[in-house]
Amino acid sequence: QHWSHDWKPG
């Protein structure tokens, strides 16, 4: 499942 918002871990 691909999320609409690209989350950046950090």
Swiss-Prot record:
Q: Which residues carry this modification: Glycine amide?
A: G10
Where does the UniProt annotation locate this protein? Secreted
Identify one Pfam family in the record. Answer: GnRH
In this UniProt entry, the residues modified to Pyrrolidone carboxylic acid are Q1
Q: Which domain of life is it from?
A: Eukaryota
Gene Ontology terms for molecular function: hormone activity
> Sorted alphabetically, which InterPro entries does this protein's record hold?
GnRH
Task: Kindly state which keywords UniProt assigns to this record, in alphabetical order.
Answer: Amidation, Hormone, Pyrrolidone carboxylic acid, Secreted
State if Cytoplasm is listed as a keyword: no
KW Secreted (keyword) present: yes
Q: Give GO cellular component annotations, separated by semicolons.
A: extracellular region
Family to which this protein belongs = Belongs to the GnRH family.
Job of this protein? Stimulates the secretion of gonadotropins; it stimulates the secretion of both luteinizing and follicle-stimulating hormones.
Protein name per its UniProtKB record:
Gonadoliberin-3
Highest lineage ranks of the organism? Answer: Eukaryota, Metazoa, Chordata, Craniata, Vertebrata
